[in-house]
C-alpha cells in the first residue's frame, strides 16, 4: 500500500492506494469522498490505520476500459481538479437503429456513413475527414503482386517509419471501448479506429518482416498460425497475403502471429485492401473464424475507400506521433472496378410511386446530401450513384425513390383513402366443400395431403401464346 498526497485542485488529500504503477507527479483520475463511480459512492475510510479521503482510479473503475492493471494516467495537460468529462469523450450518446437498416448497407458499417445519414436527415453539412497527402520524396515503393485477380478488387499499401509512441491517446481508447474494443497498442488501435470510423478494415504489418507482398492462394494445403495463436488449416482456395512465398495473413480475416506488431515496432506496412466478399465469407466459414474485418468484407465494400483509409491512418498517426514519417510511395493495385451506375428518372415518376408532391428542389437536395451526383436535363434527373452505394445496392429507379422517401419521412406522407372500389369476393361452394373434405380426411382418418408437381398440358400453353421451350422441366414427372 502507498500513502499518497493528492492535489485535487482545491486542496491536498490523503489517500491510501495499492496500485503498482503509482509514482510521484503522476497525473491521475481521482474521485473525492462523496463522489460516485459505477460501483457506487466513494466514502472516507481508514485503511491500515490511515484515513483515505478519496479514490485514485483505474480506467476499469471508471467504466472506461477493462484494464485493471493500474491507475489511469491522464495524458493531456489540464489543471488539477478538472472534471474528466471536460477533457475526454466520456458522456456518450447512443442512437438505436433498426438492424435491418444496416445489414445490407456496407456504407453504414462505419460511423462516417451514419454521420452522412444524420447530415441528410437534419439538413446539416457533413464535415470531411482530415487526411494526409502521403507526401514522400524518395522512390521506395512496396512491390505487390496479385496472383488471384478474381478474388481482389484493390490492394493499396504504404510504409511508415520513425514511430516512437506505443500507446494510443486515452480519448481514442475510450471511444474504442465504448464500441466494444479494447485498447492494444497505438498501431493496432489506429487500424481498429479507422475500421469503426470509415467501415474499411486495415492491417498493419511489422515492416521489418515484409519484403514484398504477394496476394494469392497457396499451391497446396498448409498450416498457418493466426494472431490469436491458433494453428489453422489453410486450403488451396483460401486467399492469403504472403511475404514472398511465406503467409503473413488470411486475406480479409486475420493477420499472422509472425508479422504481428509488437512493443518495439517502429515501422509498419499498412494494408488497405478490398477483397471479394464471397471469397472472404467462404474462407471465414470454412475456418470457423469470423472477425470484424470479415463481417465488413462480406458486405461488398467500396474499393474507392482503400486509399482514403491509408491517408486517414497516416494523418492520425502523425497527429499523435509527430515524428512518424511516410517512408514509401503509395502502392495501389486497382485490379477490378465496379461499373459506374447512372439512373435517369423524372418528377412524374416520383409523384406516381409516392402519391405525394415532393418538390424538385427537395429531390436534388436529398440525393446530393446522400452523396449522389444529380444533373437536371429538362424534365429529367440524371443521377450518378456514389461508389459506396454502387456495390450491389442502388441499381434501379425504385432504389432512388426509396432514398428520397425515407429522408422525406414516411410519417410525413398524407393518409388518403384509396379510390379503388373494394368488393367482397363471393365464396365458392365447391372450394368450401373441398376444404371440408380435406379436413375430414386429415383430422379424422390420419391421412396426409401431398402437394406435388402439377400436371400441365403444353398444348394449352401454346394456345395461350406462352413460350414453353425454355421452361424448366422435371425429369421424373411421376406424381404421387
Give the location of each predicted region:
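Terminal amphipathic helices with adjacent charged low-complexity linkers/tails
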Residues: 120-147, 321-350, 357, 400
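Glycine/proline-enriched, intrinsically flexible loops and inter-domain linkers
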Residues: 2-4, 127-222
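Conserved catalytic alpha/beta cores of large enzymes that bind or transform nucleotide phosphates
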Residues: 60-61, 165, 232-340
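Conserved phosphate/anionic-ligand binding catalytic regions in large, soluble enzymes, centered on
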Residues: 20-27, 103-123, 180-205, 245-267, ...
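Flexible, glycine/charged-enriched surface loops at secondary-structure junctions
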Residues: 123-134, 183-188, 317-331, 375-378, ...
Amino acid at each position: 500500500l502507498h500513502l499518497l498526497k493528492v492535489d485535487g485542485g482545491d486542496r491536498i488529500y490523503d489517500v491510501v492506494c495499492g496500485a503498482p504503477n503509482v509514482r510521484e507527479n503522476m497525473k491521475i483520475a481521482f474521485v473525492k469522498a462523496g463522489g460516485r463511480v459505477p460501483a457506487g459512492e466513494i466514502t472516507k475510510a481508514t485503511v491500515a490505520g490511515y484515513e483515505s479521503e478519496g479514490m485514485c482510479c483505474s480506467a476499469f473503475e471508471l467504466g472506461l476500459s477493462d484494464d485493471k492493471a493500474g491507475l489511469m494516467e491522464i495524458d493531456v495537460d489540464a489543471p488539477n481538479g478538472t472534471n474528466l468529462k471536460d477533457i475526454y469523450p466520456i458522456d456518450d450518446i447512443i442512437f438505436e437503429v433498426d438492424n435491418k437498416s444496416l445489414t445490407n448497407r456496407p456504407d453504414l458499417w462505419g460511423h462516417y456513413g451514419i454521420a452522412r445519414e444524420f447530415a441528410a436527415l437534419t439538413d446539416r453539412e457533413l464535415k470531411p475527414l482530415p487526411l494526409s497527402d502521403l507526401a514522400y520524396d524518395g522512390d521506395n515503393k512496396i512491390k505487390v503482386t496479385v496472383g488471384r485477380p478474381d478474388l481482389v478488387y484493390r490492394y493499396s499499401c504504404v510504409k511508415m517509419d520513425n514511430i516512437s509512441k506505443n500507446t494510443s491517446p486515452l480519448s481514442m481508447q475510450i471511444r474504442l471501448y465504448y464500441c466494444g474494443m479494447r485498447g492494444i497498442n497505438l498501431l493496432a488501435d489506429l487500424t481498429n479506429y479507422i475500421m469503426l470510423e470509415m467501415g474499411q478494415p486495415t492491417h498493419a504489418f511489422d515492416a521489418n518482416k515484409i519484403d514484398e507482398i504477394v496476394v494469392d492462394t497457396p499451391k497446396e494445403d498448409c498450416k498457418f498460425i493466426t494472431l490469436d495463436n491458433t494453428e489453422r488449416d489453410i486450403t488451396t482456395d483460401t486467399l492469403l497475403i504472403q511475404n514472398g512465398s511465406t503467409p503473413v495473413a488470411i486475406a480479409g480475416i486475420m493477420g499472422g502471429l509472425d508479422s504481428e506488431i509488437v512493443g518495439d515496432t517502429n515501422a509498419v506496412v499498412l494494408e488497405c485492401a478490398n477483397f471479394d466478399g464471397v471469397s472472404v465469407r467462404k474462407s471465414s466459414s470454412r475456418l470457423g473464424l469470423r472477425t470484424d474485418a470479415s463481417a465488413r468484407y462480406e458486405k461488398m465494400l467500396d474499393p474507392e475507400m482503400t486509399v482514403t483509409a491509408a491517408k486517414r491512418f497516416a494523418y492520425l498517426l502523425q497527429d499523435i506521433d509527430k515524428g512518424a514519417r511516410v517512408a514509401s510511395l503509395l502502392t495501389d493495385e486497382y485490379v477490378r472496378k465496379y461499373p459506374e451506375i447512372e439512373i435517369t428518372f423524372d418528377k412524374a415518376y416520383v409523384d406516381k410511386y409516392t402519391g405525394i408532391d415532393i418538390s424538385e428542389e427537395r429531390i436534388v437536395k436529398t440525393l446530393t446530401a446522400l452523396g449522389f451526383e444529380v444533373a437536371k436535363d429538362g424534365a429529367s434527373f440524371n443521377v450518378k450513384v456514389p461508389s459506396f452505394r454502387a456495390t450491389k445496392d442502388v441499381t434501379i429507379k425504385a432504389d432512388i425513390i426509396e432514398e428520397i422517401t425515407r429522408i422525406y419521412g414516411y410519417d410525413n406522407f398524407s393518409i388518403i383513402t384509396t379510390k379503388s372500389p373494394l368488393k367482397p369476393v363471393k365464396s365458392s361452394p365447391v372450394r368450401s366443400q373441398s376444404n371440408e373434405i380435406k379436413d375430414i380426411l386429415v383430422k379424422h382418418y390420419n391421412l396426409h395431403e401431398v402437394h406435388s408437381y402439377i400436371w400441365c398440358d403444353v398444348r394449352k400453353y401454346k394456345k395461350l401464346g406462352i413460350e414453353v421451350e425454355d421452361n424448366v422441366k422435371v425429369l421424373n414427372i411421376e406424381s404421387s
